[in-house]
Regions:
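Multi-pass alpha-helical transporter architecture, strongest
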Residues: 14, 223-262
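A membrane-interface helix-boundary motif in multi-pass transporters
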Residues: 203-234
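Juxtamembrane intracellular "pre-TM" segments in multi-pass secondary transporters
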Residues: 20-58, 260-262
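Single conserved hydrophobic/aromatic residue that forms the stacking wall/gate
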Residues: 1-8, 13
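Helix-to-loop junctions at the C-terminal end of transmembrane segments
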Residues: 105-118, 205
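C-terminal transmembrane helical hairpin of 12-TM major facilitator-type secondary transporters
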Residues: 119-166
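A late C-terminal transmembrane helix in Major Facilitator Superfamily
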Residues: 173-210
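Extracytoplasmic gate region of multi-pass secondary transporters
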Residues: 52-103, 163, 167, 197-198
């Protein structure tokens, strides 16, 4: 249920970005006087995208960020039950707070970025928040239930901040004619990560983290090592976000400028 909620939140975010992209493409086509001409796929566009440093930074940030959220949510409820002693009847509700936060806050943050900009800085902030969340979850002695809930709320804020800044940033890095291809390549790389990281975490849990058996005979796990892995991935996302901000200054992507120019 939690994964479905997160996917639903992500679909809402991408739907908003799709509508914005459609308007941008229509405006660009009218300005160029080519609104009636059909855009054709070109392998040259793929080459141009792949040699653009901004593509790899956005793609890496995307895969690292989402790899810290979606795979974690698969066992968030059990983490709350086992480590924090939260009742299993409400653990799923608390674990679903990031999805609820994304639904409410993404339009708010998106509106701020449209008017004020600061996309690169917001991606930095969201990545730093991820580090804090997973690092505190990884500390064995911090097991008070209220801490777990506060961390879920912070995760929800981060899950709203980064996508609301990251997806519109793609439209600043690439010309309109390359946007569809760029998004497709980014989603392709993202899906590789969303396959690989859960596979890694599942292997680590079964190999090193079994702490006992439940009454029904299934395994109980100590999630310290997986949370350390997520913390490491979040640290990598922060490094990539820093590099993206540096690239923004070097290549003039204008990520810090508002999306809507007056």
């Amino acid at each position: 249920e939690i994964s479905c909620s997160l996917v639903g939140s992500e679909m809402c975010i991408r739907d908003r970005m799709d509508k914005k992209l459609d308007k941008q493409m229509e405006a660009a086509a009218i300005a160029a006087g080519t609104e009636d001409e059909e855009e054709k796929f070109s392998f040259k566009d793929v080459k141009n995208i792949l040699v653009n440093p901004g593509f790899w930074l956005i793609a890496l940030l995307c895969v690292l960020f989402y790899s810290c959220v979606f795979p974690f949510q698969k066992f968030a409820s059990e983490l709350m039950i086992i480590k924090y002693g939260i009742n299993e009847n409400v653990a799923g509700t608390f674990a679903g707070l990031p999805a609820l936060g994304a639904l409410i806050l993404t339009p708010v943050f998106g509106g701020f970025i449209d008017k004020r900009g600061k996309s690169a800085s917001i991606m930095l902030l969201g990545s730093a928040m991820l580090i804090c969340v997973h690092f505190i979850y990884a500390i064995p002695d911090i097991n008070y239930w209220l801490v777990a809930i506060v961390l879920m709320i912070i995760l929800g804020i981060a899950f709203s901040l980064v996508p609301s800044a990251m997806w519109p940033a793609v439209a600043k890095i690439f010309p309109v004619s390359q946007l569809g291809t760029a998004y497709a390549l980014i989603f392709f790389i993202q899906n590789i990560g969303l396959w690989g990281i859960p596979t890694l975490i599942g292997w680590v849990l079964d190999a090193y983290c079994i702490s006992g058996k439940k009454p029904d005979g299934t395994n109980m796990y100590d999630y310290t090592v997986p949370m350390c892995i997520f913390t490491g991935i979040a640290c990598l996302s922060l490094i990539v976000a820093l590099l993206l901000k540096k690239a923004d200054k070097k290549y003039g992507y204008k990520l810090e400028e508002p999306n809507i120019q007056k």
